[in-house]
C-alpha cells in the first residue's frame, strides 16, 4: 500500500521527469529487451534495435500510461482498467515481464536523476511500479 509519503515522492519524481518520460520509457524498454531477452517474444513485428522508432513509440505509450497512473494514484484500478484488459485478454503478457520492466524503469530513472533518487524515492517508486503491475495483472485470474 502506498503511503501518503510514497505518493508525494512518486508525484515529485514524475514531475521532474517531465518531457523526458517517453525517452526514459523507451530506454527502459531497451534495457528490458537486453537484460531479459524472452521479453522480445511479445514484439516479433518490432525493429528492436537501439533507437528504433517502434521502441520509441512504445516507450512513449509506457510513459503515458505511467503518467496517467501518477495522476490517478489514488484509483489505479479504474485508471488502468483498459490496459489491464488489453494485457490480460489480448496480449497475454506473462506477468513477470512487468517486474522486469519495473526494474529497468528504476535503473533508468536512477541513471538520469541520481541526486533525486534517494533511498526513500527509490522505495516509493518501487512500491508504485509494483502497484501498477498488480493492477495490470489483476484480470489474469
From Swiss-Prot:
* Gene Ontology cellular component list: blood microparticle; haptoglobin-hemoglobin complex; hemoglobin complex
User: Which residues in this protein are found as Phosphotyrosine?
Assistant: 24
Q: Does the keyword Transport apply?
A: yes
Write out the tissue specificity statement of the associated record. Red blood cells.
- Mind telling me which SUPFAM superfamilies this protein's record contains? Globin-like
Question: Which residues does the record list as Phosphoserine (modified residue)?
Answer: 3, 35, 49, 102, 124, 138
Q: Which domain of life is it from?
A: Eukaryota
Alphabetic keyword roster: Acetylation, Heme, Iron, Metal-binding, Oxygen transport, Phosphoprotein, Transport
In which residues is heme b bound?
87
Its Gene Ontology biological processes? hydrogen peroxide catabolic process
Please list the GO terms describing molecular function.
Answer: haptoglobin binding; heme binding; iron ion binding; organic acid binding; oxygen binding; oxygen carrier activity; peroxidase activity
Describe its function. Answer: Involved in oxygen transport from the lung to the various peripheral tissues.
Tell me which family the UniProt entry assigns to this protein. Answer: Belongs to the globin family.
Task: Summarize the subunit comment.
Answer: Heterotetramer of two alpha chains and two beta chains.
What name does this protein carry? Hemoglobin subunit alpha
Q: Which organism is it from?
A: Panthera pardus orientalis
Provide the taxonomic classification.
Answer: Eukaryota, Metazoa, Chordata, Craniata, Vertebrata
